[in-house]
């Protein structure tokens, strides 16, 4: 079993990289977000999840830059109907924190993407809603937010994830009006 790989990126493809580790090239599948951060010649260290594809009689390697992202994949593939490829697509769109929020809030819109039907989205929410605490979101990145401020921004027409990412930067004990005002300033600049 491979736990992690550290090496130089030789090739970047649409869904994977060739990672050169001591002159051995490993094909490692990555989420779109992680793939965008890789460039030829850059040095990367990836946590590795190995999937034995019995139909093709090969082992596929999936790489992650964070333990949280790897844990999300492990939870997602336990859901009936979610393949490794589907899980990587989800992680390409949502951070572990956003996935956690979408499952907790039963936000089907946030989980909507190509190849993911409503039945599968409902199954993901149903099967993982009790397990999301296992995501162990890093306490520095995930903290309670002011739900009233989030609701106000959504009602003003901002996308839920964008609003969430903006207001999570502010301490939840600030006055709701102040959080909304600061968030609106930031969102109007973007």
Curated annotation (Swiss-Prot):
Gene3D superfamilies: 5' to 3' exonuclease, C-terminal subdomain, DNA helicase RuvA subunit, C-terminal domain, Nucleic acid-binding proteins
One GO MF term: four-way junction helicase activity
UniProt keyword annotations, A-Z: Cytoplasm, DNA damage, DNA recombination, DNA repair, DNA-binding
Region entry Domain III, spans: 147-190
Cellular localization per UniProt: Cytoplasm
Database matches in InterPro entries: DNA_helicase_Holl-junc_RuvA_I, NA-bd_OB-fold, RuvA, RuvA_2-like, RuvA_C, RuvA_C_sf
Keyword Cytoplasm: yes
Region of interest: Flexible linker: 144-147
Region described as Domain I: spans on this chain: 1-65
Gene Ontology BP annotations: DNA recombination; DNA repair
GO annotation, cellular component aspect: cytoplasm; Holliday junction helicase complex; Holliday junction resolvase complex
Segments of this protein annotated with the region Domain II: 66-143
Superkingdom to which the source organism belongs: Bacteria
Pfam families per UniProt: HHH_5 (PF14520), RuvA_C (PF07499), RuvA_N (PF01330)
Function: The RuvA-RuvB-RuvC complex processes Holliday junction (HJ) DNA during genetic recombination and DNA repair, while the RuvA-RuvB complex plays an important role in the rescue of blocked DNA replication forks via replication fork reversal (RFR). RuvA specifically binds to HJ cruciform DNA, conferring on it an open structure. The RuvB hexamer acts as an ATP-dependent pump, pulling dsDNA into and through the RuvAB complex. HJ branch migration allows RuvC to scan DNA until it finds its consensus sequence, where it cleaves and resolves the cruciform DNA.
Subunit composition and interactions: Homotetramer. Forms an RuvA(8)-RuvB(12)-Holliday junction (HJ) complex. HJ DNA is sandwiched between 2 RuvA tetramers; dsDNA enters through RuvA and exits via RuvB. An RuvB hexamer assembles on each DNA strand where it exits the tetramer. Each RuvB hexamer is contacted by two RuvA subunits (via domain III) on 2 adjacent RuvB subunits; this complex drives branch migration. In the full resolvosome a probable DNA-RuvA(4)-RuvB(12)-RuvC(2) complex forms which resolves the HJ.
Family: Belongs to the RuvA family.
Domain description: Has three domains with a flexible linker between the domains II and III and assumes an 'L' shape. Domain III is highly mobile and contacts RuvB.
Official protein name in the record: Holliday junction branch migration complex subunit RuvA
Lineage of the organism: Bacteria, Pseudomonadati, Pseudomonadota, Alphaproteobacteria, Rickettsiales
């Amino acid at each position: 079993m491979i736990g992690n790989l550290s090496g130089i990126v030789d090739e970047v493809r649409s869904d994977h990289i060739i990672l050169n580790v001591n002159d051995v090239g490993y094909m490692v599948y990555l989420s779109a977000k992680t793939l965008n951060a890789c460039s030829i010649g850059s040095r990367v260290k990836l946590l590795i999840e190995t999937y034995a594809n019995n139909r093709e009689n090969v082992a596929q390697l999936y790489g992650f830059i964070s333990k949280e992202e790897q844990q999300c994949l492990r939870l997602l593939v336990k859901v009936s109907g979610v393949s490794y490829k589907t899980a990587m697509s989800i992680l390409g769109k949502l951070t572990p924190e956003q996935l956690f929020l979408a499952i907790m809030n039963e936000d089907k819109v946030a989980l909507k993407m190509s190849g993911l039907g409503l039945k599968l989205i409902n199954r993901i929410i149903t099967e993982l809603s009790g397990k999301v605490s296992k995501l162990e979101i890093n306490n520095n990145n995930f903290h309670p937010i002011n739900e009233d401020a989030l609701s106000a921004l959504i009602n003003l027409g901002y996308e839920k994830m964008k609003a969430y990412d903006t207001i999570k930067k502010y301490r939840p004990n600030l006055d709701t009006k102040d959080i909304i005002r600061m968030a609106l300033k930031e969102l109007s600049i973007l």
